[in-house]
Amino acid sequence: DPKNRAVFSAKVIGLLRQWGYDGVVISDDLGAAVALKSVPAAQRAVRFLAAGGDLVINANPGVTAGMVAGVKKRARADDAFDQKLTASAARVLALKEKVGLYDCG
């Protein structure tokens, strides 16, 4: 994808689904990644999830609130994005159940 880094590319992430992968797509660190400095932290999370990612990894606690706010804002404004988040949450919960981490009690 010449227009997007792989982490933000629906084309690249979509290849996983085309090849039959139906599991959770997890980012590398999006919070402190030097290679992504030019992208505002909130947009890093939004763009990864919009491209088809499921779970954002962030090693910089200073940008967590901004990432969460950015994702919430986009979800409120964009039904398709909100539906992607719902599907992502379902995949994450299914994985947790599969490995015995779903029940916290």
Stretch-by-stretch model annotation:
Residues D1-A80:
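Second-shell residues forming the walls of enzyme active-site clefts
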Residues A77-C104:
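Mid-to-C-terminal alpha-helical segments outside catalytic/metal-binding sites
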